[in-house]
């Protein structure tokens, strides 16, 4: 069952793990690591409720939201696109590449965006293309990360991280709230892209998703018939037993492929950052702190240490941009298809909508870069903070949808209901606190 959750890991590594949490660690030590692992734990349970809906119905979770109210079709179309239209990941990868070879950042970022679009467009079945690339890139990233950790990290630093993991509620004075809010969302895949887990397990053929068509390339793939409308299996002892197998396997796959890998990468990247740049070090502007980390590695191990670190970072950010374009386009295409039917009575082809969204996102990203918005950290923090607010909304919607819809063996257990309520309160609290902070009403 390996596959769908590895794509989410590739998404999560690319900003929260590599950029935001290491930066917060350099500024504040491990004082906020309790919030880090709490965020990724909540995302595990959120993602499993997304999977519950799709395993049982074959529909994506956003279609379930539209069943609650047609209002959620245009609302989530905005939520699934606006936070992700800023090309921070391609810009970040181009920034690191420019430190290695003499390549201007903006042309490099544009080339990266176009390369991602072409990669998604040429594979016959898009899911297989993305899964294969993400598995390889995640393996490369972890190999580089493990080598760095083994060479650098001391046991005492691990002890400091463990202590910070249990300082629940501790908030250092002066922490930049939008960055913390974004880091909470990106402790995991974050925001609306978690909803794409529905699409991944559909295309993988899990549960009732087996009966729904996949997204195929208009250039190299064979069109598959399908509908955004799913179906619930008939009640019988045999089907209930099959459901229990589906649910058990899905939980195991997501726990191993997403939760453990995301938590491990968060811990290792933060440990490496804390070892290279002691708490309280100057982080500078934008990606300056990553350059400082690379500089320390060059001093300790020579040029190869710097090259290994920056190559890992480029792989991290490129894999994230690729997976983001795919995930955002999947969720948006579902919502466009159902919106066209609900509001205009028009039928549409899901694959064509998907590729239309992919290339529209790329075109907008190019315009943003040409307009001079080429600071990757600013773009990442903006995207992350907006996505944390989106997570607040869909925590409540998933709770409403699944508790209302499922009974018997499919029902949501009390413990998971409690976790969804906790997620709603957690992301709601930090979103509200960030808003008040930006208005100057706290501090």
Per-segment meaning from a language model:
Residues 21-25, 48-72, 95-101, 124-129, ...:
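Flexible loop linkers connecting adjacent transmembrane helices
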Residues 8, 35-66, 74-86, 323:
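Juxtamembrane transmembrane-helix boundary signature
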Residues 106-111, 304, 308, 336-371:
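Loop-to-transmembrane helix boundary motifs in multi-pass membrane proteins
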Residues 139-175, 180-199, 395-407, 430-442:
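Hydrophobic alpha-helical segments and their helix-loop junctions in multi-pass secondary transporters
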Residues 45-50, 226-241, 262-290:
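Extracellular/periplasmic helix-exit of transmembrane alpha-helices
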Residues 1-16, 182, 209-214, 218-230, ...:
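Membrane-interface "cap" regions at the ends of multi-pass membrane proteins
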Residues 129, 133-136, 330, 334, ...:
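C-terminal membrane-solvent junction of multi-pass transporters and transport-like membrane proteins
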Residues 56, 71-103, 109-113, 318-337, ...:
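Hydrophobic transmembrane alpha-helices that form the core helical bundles
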